[in-house]
Amino acid sequence: MKKQKCLFVTIAGLPNAGKSTLINSVVGKKIAIVTPKAQTTRTPIRGITIYGNTQIIFTDSPGIFSAKTKLEKSLVRSAWSVIRGNDITLLIVDISNYLKNIEKIKTILARLQHVKDKCILVINKIDLVKKTELKIGHVHLNLLYKFEKIFTISALKSDGLSDLISYLSEIAPANPWFYKEEQITDSSMSFLSAEVTREKLFLNLYKELPYSIAVITEHIQKNEDKSLIIKQIIFALRHSHKKIVLGKDGGNIKKIGIEARVELEKLFECKVHLFLFVKVRYWIEHLGEYMLDV
């Protein structure tokens, strides 16, 4: 039997580069929320995959951007902390709009030089551009940094992932596996449940409102028939926000609850009874209390 190998990998990049989609594709299950809106990942999420004798632990970090608010600054600090703590960094770049973000990418790379010398460039969303555009972007990005390796992928369609995983397995050091073989994440059921509901809030509420909302799973109960009872609290900053979350005659919260329940049943592979309660609290002043579930 071959000696076990283990590698810790950070998935970093600008918001909406496809980091969460990549980690979901790698583990083969949706463990990280995905929305069209930027900065939806608030807490680093680990996804675990096995390739031969190698266990690779990916950490999906919050997007790196120019932070202004207390919450935003906390997210960016969290992202850089994850980068420092892992063996190697994958910098994910959305090739479909990289020129618009080139200065932001340069800023990340400049800091990366002082934090983590080993970096792999992963050019994502290749399904959205022509081959000539991809080739030009590949050459341009390669000039910005001395990358260990460059891969082109479509995380959404899983194109190019096998080459990336194979390479990471090759460079992984000999170490015992950190997690059990069947484990695909170290996130708790409570956290994953809250994230699912938070995703549905992002998808159903307009503009900036979802950014001012936190979700906490208060209670999970396993029944004899293997179904789950999940009770969650949605915290809104203001009473006016609470009214919008609830919607006219409770229409919004009902729709959000139905969509979240369907997603939770896919995730946990069982019947789920979901109960949502909306409360008003200025939770942003208590980030330490909420960071695991916000």
Predicted regions and their residues:
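Conserved glycine(s) of the Walker
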Residues: G18, G160, N252
